[in-house]
Design a protein with these regions (language model features):
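Divalent-metal coordination cores built from histidine and acidic residues
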Residues: 1-105, 134-135, 209
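Divalent metal-binding pocket/active-site signature
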Residues: 104-163
């Protein structure tokens, strides 16, 4: 990478980091399972020690977020199961420890498990932590398209704009710095949302809340198959997903979504299967 002129990398995006989680958590093996495979046997879960390791093993500058999804899933798994007060506080403590020891902020992946199940109050708590340490809260938004599986209603305000509304609300409520990772417009039906998306994000800067976004430098993106699956389906245990009426409902929803999205399976290339 250095030979190409790359001197700095930013990692830990979209709610997932390779460190900072609870190594004794019951669900360590679920970390990143929708997006990547974490080898917990060779990982360094302590955020401070991980940073110290990097200082001596790479010529690159590395800026990393602490992934809310990694920490949360190590403690509570990938399901919608409500966290106990003790587990919730443990999650906040681990996130705060990372912020105290070099994390540039907290990243959330609201399109991925467990982020899709997180309510507004939890997001406010994350924003308050970032504000406390003058760090950034980075969002993989709930939707990057006009319609998505992130919201129940397929009609009305485009889902992409609803997702940015949520980000703006958290910024205004907590006052933390905001990074929208990534501002993309999936499907031709979403292209009409460009101007309003920019206006919404600029409104935070106008109110004195530092806000930025990044974009892909190429006309494609990489994600996981779960982003086209609705939340109600992902909540189901595996043994119920093959039931006839479950598959029928899923097929109907995906068919309607494709028509409204301007995006189809022909636009998807499967890179690998775990």
């Amino acid at each position: 990478m250095v030979g190409q002129g790359i001197t700095t990398v930013v990692t830990g995006n979209c709610g997932f980091s390779a460190t900072g989680y609870d190594p004794k958590g019951k669900y360590v093996d679920t970390i990143g399972s929708d997006s990547f495979a974490l080898d917990s046997k060779h990982a360094i879960p302590d955020f401070k020690k991980w940073i110290e390791y990097l200082d001596h093993h790479t010529p690159l500058n590395v800026a990393t977020y602490i992934g809310h999804g990694s920490v949360r899933s190590s403690i509570n798994g990938l399901t919608k199961k409500e966290m106990t007060k003790e587990d919730y506080q443990k999650m906040l403590d681990l996130l705060e420890y990372a912020l105290q020891n070099g994390a540039v902020g907290i990243s959330v992946g609201l399109m991925y498990r467990p982020g899709i199940f997180v309510d507004k109050e939890e997001l406010y708590d994350l924003g308050k932590l970032c504000k406390k340490y003058n760090k950034t809260m980075a969002f993989h938004a709930r939707a990057n398209s006009a319609v998505s599986m992130g919201y129940k209603s397929l009609l009305g305000r485009p889902h992409l704009l609803r997702a940015i509304d949520e980000i703006v609300d958290i910024g205004k409520t907590t006052g933390c710095k905001i990074q929208n990772s990534h501002l993309i417009f999936v499907g031709t039906k979403s292209w009409k949302c460009v101007d309003e998306s920019l206006k919404l994000l600029h409104s935070l800067n106008d109110e004195g809340i530092p806000t930025a976004f990044d974009m892909y430098s190429y006309p494609l993106g990489a994600s996981t198959i779960t982003v086209i699956l609705p939340k109600w389906y992902q909540r189901l245990p595996l043994q119920k997903r093959n039931r006839f009426f479950v598959k029928l409902r899923l097929s109907i929803e995906i068919f309607i979504t494709k028509k409204l999205l301007g995006f189809d399976f022909d636009d998807i290339q499967i890179a690998y299967v775990q």
